[in-house]
């Protein structure tokens, strides 16, 4: 969400062809697990600060990033809400083993796309550990296992995971 607030990414993702090929199929499936489809968005311009109230940066400070979009499983008890209206009406039951495989597949696809597009630095997010209630230990294990084949593919792999000030875990 942060990238959508601070850059032109939202506008790239909300064009009719993206809605038709990516978002509408997800919504029509009404499956909170979603799927491993990916959108690669090169050169999304970041023009606002990454703060609680983003501010327009001086144009000389703008920069471009390539973004890989892939949906995480939505494991909420009530997956549909005002932000995810088409994730189905019922929660899904998925074992930790099944969830691990889902995450490994998606993370591997993300890393494949990054490598194929010549990325030197990859920054991964929490991938469902926040609002979608995926278990952090399962996602972390999937990331560790998926990254094993990419240790020399990138100069840096980082995790940008938001932690509120009151949470020091």
Q: Where are each of the predicted segments found?
A:
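Macrodomain-like recognition of ADP-ribose-binding/processing modules
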Residues: 1-169
């Amino acid at each position: 969400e942060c990238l959508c607030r601070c850059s032109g990414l939202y506008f790239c993702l909300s064009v009719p062809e993206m809605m038709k090929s990516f978002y509408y199929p997800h919504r029509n499936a009404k499956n909170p697990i979603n799927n491993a489809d990916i959108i690669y968005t090169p050169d999304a311009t970041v023009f606002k600060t990454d703060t609680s109230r983003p501010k327009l940066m001086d144009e000389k400070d703008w920069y471009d990033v390539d973004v890989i979009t892939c949906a995480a499983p939505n494991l909420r008890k009530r997956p549909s809400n005002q932000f995810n209206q088409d994730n189905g009406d019922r929660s899904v039951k998925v074992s930790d083993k099944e969830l691990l495989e889902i995450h490994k597949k998606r993370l591997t696809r993300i890393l494949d796309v990054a490598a194929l597009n010549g990325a030197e630095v990859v920054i991964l997010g929490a991938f469902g550990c926040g609002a979608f209630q995926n278990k952090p230990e399962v996602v972390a294990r999937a990331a560790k296992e998926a990254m094993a084949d990419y240790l020399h593919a990138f100069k840096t792999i980082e995790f940008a995971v938001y932690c509120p000030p009151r949470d020091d875990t």
